A protein has these predicted regions:
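Anion (oxyanion) recognition and catalysis
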Residues: 29, 71, 110-111
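Short internal beta-strands
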Residues: 35-40, 77-81
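Histidine-anchored nucleotide/phosphate-binding helix
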Residues: 18-31
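A glycine-rich helix N-cap at a beta->alpha junction
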Residues: 53-81
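Short, glycine-rich nucleotide/cofactor-binding loops
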Residues: 5-19, 51
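N-terminal beta-loop-helix "entrance" segment that forms/cooperates
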Residues: 43-57
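C-terminal structural segments of small proteins and small subunits
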Residues: 86-112, 116-119
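Short beta-alpha junction loops
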Residues: 41-44, 84
Length: 119
């Protein structure tokens, strides 16, 4: 199987685009692929406990359900450290399975993966 890093940059400002990386991560994991979900820019807010509870894209599964699915599947959720600091998000604010990572971690993961998918 393949390995993916799926990145999301949109948060509550665009519910549809915010939901798509979680949907892609869920489907990729269900197909047996290795997945890292990288949240950066406004998407880091989705890594904060409770933020995704009220996000639903147009005709899409609610984000809270997709988040629960990727958490249950063991998908690593990486939250951009600089983006989190800018939004006053600390590791204690994050959902289960999420961790704060830096650009060196992201670049290393991109270099090691078969594919990168960006939303």
């Amino acid at each position: 199987m393949a390995s993916f890093i799926i990145s999301g940059s949109r948060g509550t400002d665009d519910p549809t685009m915010a939901t798509l990386p979680f949907m892609a991560a869920k489907v990729a994991k269900e197909q047996g692929h290795d997945v890292v979900l990288w949240l950066w820019n406004e998407a880091v807010t989705l890594g904060r406990k409770g933020t995704g509870d009220h996000v639903t894209g147009v005709n899409l599964t609610p984000l809270k359900d997709l988040l629960a699915a990727v958490q249950a599947a063991g998908v690593q959720i990486w939250v951009c450290g600089a983006c989190a600091v800018a939004r006053q998000i600390s590791s204690g604010d994050l959902v289960a399975g999420a961790s704060i990572k830096g650009m060196p971690d992201y670049i290393k993961a991109v270099a090691e993966r078969d594919r990168t998918i960006a939303f």
